[in-house]
Each structure stands twice: as C-alpha cells, then as structure tokens.
C-alpha cells in the first residue's frame, strides 16, 4: 500500500470546502490527485459530476492511468464495484469547453478547433481580404501576420471589446477574420475563442447556467499556476464561485512558466480571496531529487546568492521550503535524501567548446553507472540523460562534440511557426503547383510567396 506524508493524507481527506494544494516539484501531486478522485467515487460522488482539468493531453493520459489504478485498488478492497472511469472528464479545459459547447448549444456542433498552423495559413491566404495591408507598424507582411495573430490571442484571453479599439483598420480586420472562420464551410474556433464562447453562453443564459452548475460537484485543476484569466472565469462559472462545486486547485507559483501565453500567477496567489472555505495544503517533500538539487532550487526561487551569482527570485510568492526525502521501508519513516558528489556542478567556461567538452565528459562518466530504476538495478544509458539549452541556437558546439565522440542524441524543440518544416513543405508544394522556383522561406522576403486561397479552408 502507498505510504503518504501527513500533508498528502490531509489533502486526500479534506471534505469541508475548496482546496488549494501547493505541490512542489516531485511531491507526488498526480498520485494525490488520482487517489482523491478515486476516494470521492468510493464515497458515492457520481462520476459524471467530476471534472479534472490538465494542462496537456499527455498529462491527461497519465492522470487517467493513475485513476484507473486507484479505482482498481479500491475494487480489490471491496469499496467499489465498478473500476471504470465512466464519465469522469479528464482532459484539457479547451477540449472540455468545445465538448460542452456542442452539447448545450446545437449551433456549435459543426465547429472544430483551429490550430496555430491552420490559423496562420488562413490569414496568409486572406491577407488582402482581411485588410491587413492597411495595418501600420510592421516591417514586413510576415511581421504583420505575427502581430495580428498575437492580437487575436490577446483579445480572447483578456476578454477585450474589439469595437473599443482606436485603430479602425484593426477593428475591421478582426471582424473580417472572425466572420470568415465562423461561416460555413469553415466553422472554426481557436483555443482561446472556445473558452470565450462557452463563457458567453453560460453567462447570458440563466437556464443553461443553472443546469451546468447543478451538474458538476468537484472540479480539479492541475497546473493551476498556468491558468489565465479567461480560464479562471470559466472555472468560477462552472463552480458558481466554489459554492455548488468543490474546486481543488493544484499547482506551484514557483513553477509558473506560461506567462507569455497569458497565464497569470496572480490566480494561484489570490485563490483564497475568491473562493469560500479554502484550505491550503503544501506538499513540500520532493521524492525525486537529492538534498543538493533541492537546496539550489530553493535558493533560485527565493532570490538567494549561489556562488558569485545572484539568482533572480519571485518578488511575491507563497511561503514554502522544499525538502528532499524518501520513505525508508526498514525504519518505516520518511528520511532526508542526502546529496552525492556530482549532484550539482556550478561551472563557468571560457568558451562554448570548453563547455561542450565538459558536458560530453560527464555523459561518458555517467554511462553505465548503477541506477535503481523503479526497483530494478541497471546501468545508466544515454536515454536517461538530457541537455537543456536556452534555445536551439546554442546547441551547435555541443552537438559537434557529441558527434565527434559518437554519442547518440536527439534534438527536441520547436522553431518559429513560419520557419517550421510543415510551412516549408506547404510553400514548396505551392511553388510546384504554380511552376515557381522554390525559395527557402525568408521572413524578410515574404512578398515572394504565392499562396493558394483555398489551401487553408475546410473541404
């Protein structure tokens, strides 16, 4: 049986109101989340009344797997008969919003999500129709398109009224775009628009609002620190401000990394001010790392000095100190996970090549070292190691050194949308269609592109 810390057990047992779980890195939050949901089912909470929002589809898959495991465990104990997930919703807030929107408002049943690439292709193909050539302030067409897409995202995330803008050309362009993607045969909604549309429908229709608020009893929100204002508005609507449904928010303000997408750490910092009867529980035990790694992480987020460097900390954060522990079966206690030599290196290099040599040396030193992986002792492999870089532009010296030593690697990451492989392939295809010379996409030479007007629209 799983052994829980005092705080983890408290998070599992609390039933007297809304819950804010501050979960430090490696603190077992997914285990606590899945166990709490399974326990609610065993207590008779209808599965169809439970929502679990995750930030990604991958996280949703992991949570589903964990909940199934916990439900199966409860069935073996004789506490439930059915170990299936049933109609528990586990997934992203965008997918949930589209699903619910189609269910409560038939006119949206033909709509589909428009992803970033298709949105960009539509805007490119309808550049003149949308009047984007009239917009000022950009140095090129591609820069105009980038700014227009970002403007659209901000409009929906921040719930802005387009008609209040001072730039009439921008107002016209936004309306032209909105009318185009929502008319047949397109019927598209962006990720941000989906939430905006659902929020609008619930707010404007009292009967639908009452129906939705009576339907759900428990709303779980993972990675709550990355929730933006529009998403928070929807969560409050679904839960009637935490009065008809219990909101269990799980996150860590120290791990907020999506502010560039509109997420605001303020939501997690002020959760207790917006919802009634909130209990805050902090899961501060890191089961993943040693003391040295946790110590440097604590120093980073609290603004302490590390060596000769000042590490930038958050000006406002929830008080917490992460600790490194593991459960010792022999003593039946949680004990500190002590640091080992080499857990943390703080190095300064005179050149990129010197840094690359150090990294390659460490990889070769670590290869084959005995490692306890989920109870199985094995040697470390290349697949157990990763190199984090500021951007793909900083990888060449490292990859050159890895190549020289025949160390296998895979580069993962994303380039800009208009420099992506997909866009290059589409561009090449259009060049073939129009018997035009293929030119590698260059943001500064966007005038040389030719696009087929119907390429991005639905068949």
Predicted regions: what they are:
Residues 17, 45-49, 84-87, 243-245, ...:
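Short glycine-/polar-rich loops that comprise or flank the Walker A/P-loop
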Residues 1-107, 210, 353:
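P-loop NTPase Walker
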Residues 27-30, 277-279, 285-407, 434-437:
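Helicase P-loop NTPase motor core
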Residues 14-15, 83-87, 105-192, 216, ...:
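ATP-hydrolysis module of ASCE/P-loop NTPase motor domains
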Residues 245, 274-275, 339, 379-459:
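ATPase/helicase motor core of nucleic-acid motors
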Residues 36, 62-70, 96-100, 122-126, ...:
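Alpha-helical scaffold elements adjacent to nucleotide-binding pockets in ATP/GTP-utilizing enzyme cores
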Residues 2-13, 17-22, 59, 89, ...:
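Conserved helicase NTPase motor core
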């Amino acid at each position: 049986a799983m052994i829980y810390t005092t705080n983890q057990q408290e998070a599992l047992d609390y039933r007297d109101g809304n819950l804010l779980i501050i979960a430090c890195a490696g603190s077992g939050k997914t285990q606590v989340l899945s166990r709490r949901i399974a326990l609610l089912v065993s207590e008779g909470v209808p599965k169809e009344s439970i929502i679990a929002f995750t930030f990604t589809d991958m996280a949703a898959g992991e949570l589903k797997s964990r909940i199934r495991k916990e439900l199966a465990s409860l069935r073996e104990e004789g506490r439930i008969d059915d170990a299936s997930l049933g109609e528990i919703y586990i997934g992203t807030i965008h997918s949930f919003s589209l699903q619910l929107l189609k269910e409560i408002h038939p006119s949206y049943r033909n709509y589909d999500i428009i992803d970033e690439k298709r949105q960009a292709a539509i805007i490119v193909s309808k550049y003149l129709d949308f009047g984007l050539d009239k917009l000022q302030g950009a140095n090129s067409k591609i820069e105009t398109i980038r700014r227009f897409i970002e403007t659209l995202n901000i409009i929906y995330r921040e719930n802005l009224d387009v008609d209040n803008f001072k730039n009439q050309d921008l107002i016209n362009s936004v309306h032209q775009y909105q009318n185009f993607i929502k008319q047949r045969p397109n019927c598209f909604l962006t990720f941000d628009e989906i939430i905006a549309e659902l929020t609008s429908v619930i707010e404007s229709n009292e009967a639908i609002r009452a129906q939705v608020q009576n339907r759900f009893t428990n709303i779980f929100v993972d990675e709550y620190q990355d929730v933006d204002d529009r998403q928070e508005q929807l969560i409050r609507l679904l839960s009637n401000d935490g009065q008809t449904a219990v909101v269990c928010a799980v996150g860590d303000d120290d791990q907020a990394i999506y502010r560039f997408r509109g997420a605001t750490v303020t939501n997690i910092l002020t959760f207790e001010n917006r919802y009634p009867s909130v209990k805050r529980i902090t899961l501060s035990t890191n089961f993943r790392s040693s003391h040295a790694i946790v110590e440097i992480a604590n120093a980073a987020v609290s603004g302490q000095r590390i060596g000769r460097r000042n590490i930038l900390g958050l000006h406002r954060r929830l008080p917490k100190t992460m600790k490194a522990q593991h459960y010792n079966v022999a003593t039946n206690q949680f004990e500190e996970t002590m640091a080992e030599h080499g857990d943390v290196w703080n190095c300064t290099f005179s050149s990129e090549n010197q840094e690359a040599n150090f990294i390659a040396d460490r990889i070769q030193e670590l290869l084959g070292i005995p490692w306890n992986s989920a109870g199985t002792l094995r040697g470390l492999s290349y697949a157990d190691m990763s190199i984090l870089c500021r951007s793909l532009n900083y990888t060449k010296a490292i990859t050159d050194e890895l190549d020289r030593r025949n160390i296998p690697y895979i580069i993962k990451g994303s380039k800009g949308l208009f420099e992506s492989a997909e866009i290059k392939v589409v561009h090449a295809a259009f060049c073939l269609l129009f018997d035009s010379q293929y030119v590698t996409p260059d943001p500064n030479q966007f005038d040389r592109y030719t696009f087929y007007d119907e390429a991005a629209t639905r068949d």
